[in-house]
Regions:
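Extended ligand-binding regions for polar small-molecule ligands
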Residues: 29-34, 75-84, 141-151, 163, ...
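Extracytoplasmic small-molecule ligand-binding "clamshell" domains
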Residues: 35-114
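Beta->alpha turn/N-cap motifs
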Residues: 52-57, 92-97, 106-118, 141, ...
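A conserved helix-loop-strand patch within extracytoplasmic ligand-binding domains
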Residues: 87, 95-98, 115-119, 123-125, ...
Length: 280
């Protein structure tokens, strides 16, 4: 846990320091550095940014029950950044664990799906300024916690000791952490199914590992249904941002400029309030 906190703090210090430098000069115009940038040139021709997302991460992104459209905090924020640049976004529904490779291969211009800025991912792609910081949380049915005599667990290894199988979406950071800790893990291709199976009484999973505000969203949804889900484990986590290919420096710089403007003028905090995401 100490290692996770240390790494997270280093990443936060780097990205926040960069953010402060940009926000100090808020009205930054779109840039086009010298040299060829095929991704940005194509975006300029089409006026469209191709973005991949997995819409099973409420309140970051989800399908509207009425319209079927992809909506959510990150969706609204990315759309606002694009509008700031005189562009629009075409949203592509794609599995979470396929987004980074699709961005690297040029099939998508950007990934927007609650991506944490981790050291491993920084080797593969570049990230915009962070829009949020999160906590990692493992949640359980309160009835299960009571039956096992659990109030709070302090390490991931405690779940192994207590014989608790933890569900998680495949391909994300939490899966790696659980496996490294020797915890019995069950994976799903989307982020909603682990939570739904947890409350349905599926005996193959007794807990789910995800980040706030995703965990908070599900806890509140289940509470509305009279189902008590509680946090059994929590720890500080990584900041969250949008990602682009390392060959997309112009898109990255321009999106950072747009995002800095939206932080400065209060749009980001307004959207967080709208989607019930803490502003700290």
């Amino acid at each position: 846990m100490a290692k996770i906190i240390t790494v997270a703090l280093v990443v936060i210090m780097l990205v926040v320091g960069f953010a402060v430098g940009i926000i100090a000069s808020p009205f930054i115009l779109p840039q086009n550095p010298s040299g060829e940038d095929a991704v940005w040139n194509h975006i300029q021709e089409t006026k469209v940014i191709e973005v991949g997302t997995d819409p099973t991460w409420p309140p970051y992104q989800l399908r509207d029950n009425v319209t079927g459209n992809i909506v959510g905090f990150e969706v609204d924020l990315a759309n606002a950044c694009a509008e700031n640049l005189g562009l629009t976004i075409h949203w592509n529904d794609i599995g979470f664990d396929n987004i980074i490779i699709s961005v690297q291969q040029g099939q998508l211009d950007m990934g927007v799906s609650g991506f944490s800025i981790t050291p491993d991912r920084l080797k593969e792609v570049d990230f915009t300024l962070p829009h949020s910081t999160t906590e990692g949380q493992i949640v359980m049915l309160q009835s299960t916690m009571t039956a096992k005599g659990i109030t709070t667990l302090h390490t991931l290894e405690d779940f192994k000791t207590n014989g608790i199988t933890v569900g998680v979406q495949s391909g994300n950071v939490q899966e790696t952490e659980l496996r490294d800790a020797g915890v019995d893990v069950r994976t799903w291709s989307d982020s909603a199914s682990p939570f739904q199976d947890l409350v349905s009484g599926n005996p193959s999973v007794q807990a789910v590992y995800a980040e706030t505000p995703i965990t908070t969203n599900w806890i509140n949804q289940f509470a509305d249904q009279g189902i008590s889900v509680s946090v059994a484990y929590t720890h500080p986590y990584y900041p969250v941002a949008f990602l682009v290919s390392k060959n997309s420096q112009t898109l990255l710089q321009n999106f950072d400029s747009a995002l800095a403007n939206l932080i400065y003028d209060g749009t980001v905090d307004h959207l967080k309030a709208q989607w019930q995401i803490p502003t700290t």
